Amino acid sequence: MKKIRFTLLALLIVTLTSAQNFNGFALYNEGGGNTTYLIDENQNLAHTWNMSTECNYTVQLKENGNLVRGTKGNASVFSTGNIASGAGQVQEIAPDGSIVWSFDYADNDHISHHDLTLVGDNVLLTAYEKKSSTELNAAGFNNASSEKWPTHFVELEADGNGGATIVWEWHIWDHMCQDTDPSKPNYVANISYNPELIDINMLSGGSGDWFHVNGVDYNEDLDQIVFSSRFASEIYIIDHSTTSAEAASHTGGNSGMGGDILYRWGNPSNYDLSGAQVIPNAVHDVRWITDDGRPNGGFLQIFNNSGVSNNQSAIDGIETPWDDNTNTYLRSSGQPFSPSSYTTRYECTSGSPYSADGQSASDRMSNGNIFVNASLGQGGGGSGTMYEVDSLGTILWGPTSGGLKGFRYECDYPGITALEPFMTNTTSTSCFDATPISENDEVDNLVLFPNPAIDHITINNKGVKEIYNIMGVRVVKTSSTEINVNHLASGIYNIRIADRNIKFIKK
């Protein structure tokens, strides 16, 4: 007879009011290096992925404990001058270093860039596509003399055979406008009347890396994508609920706007409106702050590289004018999108290693602390500095050596639970500290029984309960207080209760 044992962990995760760093892990790779590192809150190494090819910029941990990373594939097929951290290939890597799947995106006209994000189980890549000077001039670009590489996104779904398939794409080229030549496509009489489109002439310069999109994030609740452009000094939101055909048009999707820009912020002069340029130069790593009750949940957050001065960066929070009733970002006629300035700001200490003029990343932890990864840039050997500050700006964790773009994962992230059996060190983190308690013992009035269990468990909580296996796959979701587990294999499971931030492990 099989037995499924439940162990309640006396671990209550709450919003902390005292000044302390948040427990969890940091994931990073050094640009140009072959190894990705996972360290715990005490800066001890917990796991590494050692690969035969170098990482370029971004690595992320999936809920199943696997790593997703960009790497440099056959980039020689594309004229890559001035491409920062070129890519051409993306991989999903198992904890033991084996390649689950790999996908090459590099040919004479396209190449993946250095950033990516997860869309559920899929991977969204930033990429370039080549446009000749002839194509540029035909589209209304002013006197193009060389090729440009406008941004596009491709979403990949693993095909189960070691590769992946493109299931969705969006191209900035489909959403350009110009006001210089009425005889050419995409002509508009007034750029400021069309903030949903990108002025093809708003950026000049000789580099093919025209916009340099360097950060991308996905919001599952809104089904939207946000991305940042270093050279435009601006961030943008687009609709992801579209088909690829709708994404190439101006209608369709939840927004009804197809692939047009839903929201933009940081530099109103890009669409010919007056207003403060809150992003004076480079910007990196725009992302949504998780909206789960943590401070400023639902805001956007950016690493504003020169937000304070040329030598001092800022982590800015932006409360967007999203309206739930109309499902739109509100904007007054003739005015730029609000807010007129940042909503929240943490001013990084001036100079290296706490500020950075390029690359870099940030995140907001569930206790309100801000995680910062200031890159030392290409000249810094692909490394950077990671640290965590509280609401007063006091450094509570770090500084410690990191990479160009790090990610912080808290103890209850399913990918951390799935990765635990593969970690070389679990004793120096509090994430896995647990004292088993017998059946009918309580944690904050919560009771689970019987323990061990064979076919049913009872939990005296009416909230939604989700049970995950050790690979981070959800196997049960129910609001019932009595749960049938007879169909589950023996093993360790993680139970998450939606209306309570309490973590349990079921054995």
List each model region and its residues.
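Amphipathic, positively biased hydrophobic alpha-helical segments used for protein targeting
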Residues: L9-L11, E54, S76, G379, ...
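C-terminal outer-membrane/trafficking sorting elements
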Residues: E41, E439-K507
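Sec-dependent signal peptide recognition
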Residues: K2-L9
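N-terminal signal peptide c-region/cleavage motif recognized by signal peptidases
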Residues: V14-L16
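Residues in flexible loops and secondary-structure boundaries
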Residues: L9-L12, N161, Q178, Q224, ...
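In a subset of proteins, long, contiguous C-terminal domains/tails are tracked
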Residues: K2, G403-F432, M471-V473, H487-K507
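Histidine-/acidic-rich catalytic cores in large beta-rich domains
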Residues: Q20-A434
